[in-house]
Amino acid sequence: MAAACSLLHPPALHAQTAEQGHLPEIAVKGPRDASIGTADSASEGAAEKASFQSRPKLRPGDIVEAVPGVVATQHSGDGKANQYFLRGFNLDHGTDFAMRVAGMPVNMPTHGHGQGFADLNFLIPELVSGVRYRKGPYFADSGDFSLAGSASLDYVSVLDSPFAEFTLGQNGLRRLLAAGSRTVDDQTWLGAVELEGNDGPWQVPEHLRKTNAVLRYSQGSASRGLSVTAMAYQSRWTSTDQIPQRLVDSGELSRFGSLNPTDGGRTRRLSLSASWFDKGPEGDTELSAYAIDYRFGLFSDFTYFLANPAQGDQFEQTDRRRIYGAQATHRRPNRIGGLDGILSVGAEWRGDRIGEVGLYPSQFRQRLGTVRNDKVSEDQIALHAQQLVELGANVRSYVGLRGTWLGYDVQGREPVYGALNSGRGHQSLLSPKAGLAWTVAPAHELYLNAGQGFHSNDVRGATIRLDPQTGLPAERVPALVKGTGSELGWRFQPDERLSLTVAVWQLQLGSELVYVGDAGTTEPGRASKRHGVESTLRWQIDGRWRVEADLAWSRARFRGASPDGEGNFVDNAVERVAAAGVVWQQGPWMATLRLRYMGPRALDTLDSVRSRPVTLLNFGGTYAVNRQLTLGLQVFNLAGRKGNDIEYFYASCTASEVLSDRCGGGIADRHVHPMEPRSVRLSARWTF
């Protein structure tokens, strides 16, 4: 019954007194660590605090690279969501990888820029208490966008001591973070404020201006408690989008140059969330609710003068919405046919009230017309249940079922096609899950998991009739797209210092039909299949040294017959990812070195053009001068490599190519956004 006891063990959040010469640390115990006797799969886990807090982070979203196999890059300004890669998916800005922060979903359905848009720039990494992750559609409580995986992040509720930290870096980087907490009896208030500015290495300065604040109230004990969290975030920036490789090769444009200095954006996010839990020998109950007010505006230009040789191809995307949601879960021990078990049940609701989601052609940030302007109401309701059973002393299994209902109402406000592309509808599906774990020896455990999951599509694609740019009939997409996956895994864990996992997985999607926010129309895709192998190593060698290593290989192909002129490669699907890190800590010193490799990938369905591999090496270190002052150093791209954060292959046309009549129907080329050159950041933290 070890698994049952672990499932019902209450979380404990407590501060530990920092040793002299060390940074204040928050010790956090999750409700269930992924270990032998408690884990449900080989690919689930919890990132060690020493791992994600010590690693150098160029951007807040880099923290998700603590999830093995995940790569987070950027192809535009630092106020925009990262580009994510995992398990053979180019996840764009979040499709098929679900993220939650403080119990609130981050992914945005029917978003102005792209489905599943997951912007983590409001995150304050220093406050993160834990990163828990899962891979695959194997769990009943995992819903939309979680086909490839999911990650859940939370903030601490208490700090050892208040602190202020100032960071200064190259290219105009400056950042101020102040945070503290106060506890009276069983009630704690925590607050943090972050201010950041950055110009970046770009020829057109980024002029990033970011303001961020967190206020959390918590009270109670380890067995019963309440927390309320308020967050406020806003930023604005000028972005350097991807540029044609041909201009870089000819010397016409710097790697860090821009073809449109008016690209950029702004975003604002206000949220209020609350959670309550009650844990005891008879069961656990958790309730949570949230409300989010969100504003987003983005100006982009990817093809320059291809579609509109006179005024250019810049476009504006907008999103203005309020999000409401709530969820309830209950877990209790039970007996099934004389066998010990745990029954978990839950209910979820999310409602997006989108006042405006729009796409507009623009020039110098001035609108020239309207492609789409819609008001959307979207609700998703889910019920789920999962039964865990101890089949014997060394074998446990679970079966689960998730029922999801999606309802939507699209009201088009574009004067020509808006009414025709309006509509309402709903779709539902059932997603079965199952898993088996066998402890074959005290240090070895095998896992078998299978299940169905889904991701939602932009619901504008479910009501569309006519392409708003051409007036031609457009193909509708299903609101929910089903995927089926399975996984076989092994975990070796002789003690708490060493953990090694291997997972072999496969995932099939019935269709990759998507609504393309950049075009305002739908793009039909084909059924696909992915499979791969992942391995992770976590080894605390002794009190000073810690080593981590991750390897991931995947193969992604479209299924079925290929249309004329196309192949079966899923374009932009990363095939090989490797990461390694070493952390050394002794006395007042701490140092870490982290390496990330992202292998080449097909940039078209024929695999005729491939991206170049990218290797990135980062360094971070701190020195605690005394109990109050800690100095820090971060060096990004330590080796000074000239790789690309992102590569695409498509046709574009520049102004000079239009004037010289060289454009024709566009020039197919790589379009790249370089990773940042070597840069140094210095920080000083004063603990009060």
Which ranges hold each PLM region?
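N-terminal periplasmic "start-of-domain" segments of outer-membrane beta-barrel proteins
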Residues: P24-G61, D78-Q83
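Extracytoplasmic beta-strand/coil segments of soluble accessory domains associated
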Residues: G61-M108
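Short acidic/polar hinge/loop motifs at secondary-structure boundaries
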Residues: P105-K135, D154, V477
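Transmembrane beta-barrel wall of Gram-negative outer-membrane proteins
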Residues: L168-G197, W202-T240, T262-D284, R332-P333, ...
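Face-selective signature of the C-terminal outer-membrane beta-barrel domain
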Residues: G225-Y233, G265-P415, A437-T439, P494, ...
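Membrane-embedded beta-barrel scaffold of Gram-negative outer-membrane proteins
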Residues: S275-F277, D284-F302, T439, E445-H455, ...
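Gram-negative outer-membrane beta-barrel transporters
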Residues: H330-R332, A393, L406, S499-L509, ...
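C-terminal beta-signal and adjacent terminal beta-strands/loops
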Residues: F454, P600-A602, Y623-F688
